[in-house]
């Protein structure tokens, strides 16, 4: 867990998380979070989903591996006047009793835990009968993946991350314990320029920050140029940049 903690403690993740707002809203709305629901936000990050669930009256707990992110989540909750419990911990080994949550949610978070079987077992264990489950998972981005492969042999997000973007894998992991539904989605990343997107990712996306730390100055600049060139291909007629990122939305109900 120490390596993951180091990776996810870097950068200003809250800036990137702000771009996920439409998906965060979608998740909370589809899960029907309401007053009194006991909600667990897995890999809560800087707390965006947790705060939205609390606004709806949920009794919310968020857990994350990175204390710097949790500190920002606590600040955000305090600004909102939201009473949220934030715990430092590993989503593969949750420090909670059996069947103690009505809603389990994760927005592009729990998918980064490497042991999928452990994650699935823990989701089932802490969910009460009839509990609602909702999480989002990135689908492969072939062009971006090819770019990163020019700088590292290993996928920067981890080899297993995109498995969660496959319906058959989710069924294999969770189908025994949850009735599952799936919905494809696209998140549009918009900016005035490709350079603006580079600044966002190089300062706020922990896997990209970790990759940059592994490269010397010349290779970092090479990655910078390649990244900007890629996103320049998403120029719109009005001169801005609008790039799609596909994801899978998973909804479930505990059997």
What residues fall within each predicted segment?
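Class I SAM-dependent methyltransferase SAM/SAH-binding core
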Residues: 38-93, 118
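A short glycine-rich, Lys/Arg-flanked "PGG" loop and its adjoining helix->strand segment in the class I
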Residues: 117-132
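A generic alpha-to-beta junction signature in SAM-dependent methyltransferases
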Residues: 31-33, 54, 127, 174
